[in-house]
Amino acid sequence: HIDPACLDTLNSDLPWSGDDNMPAVLLENNVEYPVKFRYRGIYSASHYLGGKKSFRLSLKKEGPFKPYRKLNFINPKSFNMVNNHMGMWIAGRMGVATPWNEMVFVRINDEDHGVMELYEQPGGDFERNRKLTKEEVPVYRGEYPPITGRELTEKRTLWRKASNWEYVSDADS
């Protein structure tokens, strides 16, 4: 559940207004958990246009989906809705470490939003959560440059500058 006034604020000037974290409550197995709610996808209109918007929930450390702290609920771009999900499943079966991914039915404020794709947000604990190594692995998280005006960059520039990357693990690099 999220306060309708908070949703109005997030929806007020999309995509610019959707990035603020708002307090919300996640109901899982009849237990309420405090979370932060925000929209996703400023660079991809399919995430924020229409009634079914992609969003992220940030949970406390002891949340219902631990060890995962950030969960992305994606409105899949493909019409059959399973292309990415099946790709992740196949990669996992082949031994590739993949983010946790499920197809889930979503309700927000007692309103059905249908099936969405749930992804964990990988971070510095990705390898540790999967027990892939005995030692810490250097992990960097890439973020697109901040939007400073109301213009989006013409092309995605994530790989063009080292300043777009943040060190997010405890390992020596």
Regions found by a protein language model. Name each.
Residues 1-173:
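Phosphate/dinucleotide-binding and metal-coordinating scaffold of catalytic cores
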